[in-house]
Regions:
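Contiguous beta-strand/loop segments that form the cofactor/metal-binding neighborhood of enzyme cores
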Residues: 1-175
Length: 175
């Protein structure tokens, strides 16, 4: 779930925090390592109730092309957020132009929001959004590792336990 979890956040935000109804996925382990058993690449295809689809693809393999980007293809254009900037092409074309006197660092901005909430005594609670986003990532992992379509309800009601059974401090731990 750690792989590209924030890309899953972006998909949820693009869908106005509505969670997908199901997903399918493919993935695997290309590069054997000294231990470990998690996928080093996965692609998840999320489906929303309105028929919209969102795709998340990632890999953790040295020497490969790397990009973190969000592209939303709509009927009137394409929105794109990459390390090179943000823009919309099509009917409502737009390009982000940073103001020289403003901060845009995401870490600075999240800290400013936190400090403002403390000073104003207003709770800042993203718990529900974070829980749903994490569950969305878990649902994608479940689909990838099982090769099955997984619904939101199946993921929520799953009894899957990935923790090794550790009965003592001397118990062997599978890597």
């Amino acid at each position: 779930v750690e792989q590209a979890v924030h890309t899953v956040d972006w998909l949820a935000w693009a869908m106005k925090d509505q969670m997908p109804v199901s997903c399918t996925a493919v993935g695997g382990r290309q590069i054997p390592a000294n231990g470990g058993n998690i996928f080093d690449h996965i692609e998840v295809n999320y489906l929303w109730e309105n028929g919209a689809r969102g795709f998340m693809a990632q890999r953790q393999i040295n020497g490969c092309f790397g990009e973190t980007a969000l592209r939303i293809l709509g009927t009137k254009g394409i929105a794109e957020i990459t390390g090179r900037g943000s823009s919309i092409t099509g009917e409502n074309a737009w390009k982000f132009k940073p103001a020289k006197d403003k901060k845009y660092d995401m870490y600075d901005l999240e800290h400013e929001d936190l400090f403002l909430s403390i000073r104003d005594n207003k709770a800042l609670n993203d718990g529900d959004r974070m829980m749903k986003s994490t569950m969305m990532a878990i649902m994608g992992r479940m689909a990838g590792y099982t090769g099955q379509q997984v619904t939101w309800e199946q993921a929520l009601n799953s009894k899957e336990n990935l923790m090794p059974e550790i009965t003592s401090w001397d118990s062997p731990v599978t890597v």
